[in-house]
Swiss-Prot record:
Descriptive protein name: Oleosin 21.2 kDa
Topology in membrane: Multi-pass membrane protein
UniProt lineage: Eukaryota, Viridiplantae, Streptophyta, Embryophyta, Tracheophyta
Taxonomic source organism: Arabidopsis thaliana
Role, per record: May have a structural role to stabilize the lipid body during desiccation of the seed by preventing coalescence of the oil. Probably interacts with both lipid and phospholipid moieties of lipid bodies. May also provide recognition signals for specific lipase anchorage in lipolysis during seedling growth.
Skewed-composition ranges (Gly residues): 22-31
Family: Belongs to the oleosin family.
Positions carrying N-acetylalanine: 2
Source organism, top-level taxon: Eukaryota
Name of a matching Pfam family: Oleosin
Compositionally biased spans, kind Basic and acidic residues: 1-14, 172-193
Location of region: Polar: 2-56
Length: 199
């Protein structure tokens, strides 16, 4: 009796196909109801990475790694240099800062006097040309004045850059001189002691 009630499941119309066999886009079973009609095969890449991708990866990883390592070393060196230079700057700042301020103020005074002199000379020139009756129109005069002022500003900016570089060089020279100068207090103490014993 048990054999008569058994259901034969072999008459189902499933046609299983491996995703690696057959043509592209075929379904896994009859009715073509897979994922997007392509089954598992449509979800898997068709081929591996190309040779150019592998080559660029093999070249890029060491280059990027070495650049990152170099950046880390430079950052560490900068921090160490700052830690060494900051106490020296604080130690010599009573000499460097007033000297830099004095030189900067003097150069600012020279530049200001030069600009005022150029402005005065251009004003006198304009007045003399006006009194002589030079037939210039107002826009030409304004253009001339603009060019003169632009030249004066460019000259002042160039001189300012040169003076800033000069001040920086002088400050570095003073710092190097103070660092290289020997500070031996023990010999002075022995000299004064020798003088007192000789007396």
């Amino acid at each position: 009796m048990a054999d008569t009630h058994r259901v034969d499941r072999t008459d189902r119309h499933f046609q299983f196909q491996s995703p690696y066999e057959g043509g592209r886009g075929q379904g896994q079973y009859e009715g073509d109801r897979g994922y997007g009609g392509g089954g598992y095969k449509s979800m898997m890449p068709e081929s591996g990475p190309s040779s150019t991708q592998v080559l660029s990866l093999l070249i890029g990883v060491p280059v990027v790694g070495s650049l990152l390592a170099l950046a880390g070393l430079l950052l560490a060196g900068s921090v160490i240099g700052l830690m060494v230079a900051l106490p020296l700057f604080l130690l010599f700042s009573p000499v460097i800062v007033p000297a830099a301020l004095t030189i900067g103020l003097a150069m600012t005074g020279f530049l200001a006097s030069g600009m005022f002199g150029l402005t005065g000379l251009s004003s006198i020139s304009w007045v003399m040309n006006y009194l002589r009756g030079t037939r210039r129109t107002v826009p030409e005069q304004l253009e001339y004045a603009k060019r003169r002022m632009a030249d004066a500003v460019g000259y002042a900016g160039q001189k300012g850059k040169e003076m800033g570089q000069h001040v920086q060089n002088k400050a570095q020279d003073v710092k190097q001189y103070d660092i290289s100068k020997p500070h031996d207090t023990t010999t002075k103490g022995h000299e004064t002691q020798g003088r007192t014993t000789a007396a």
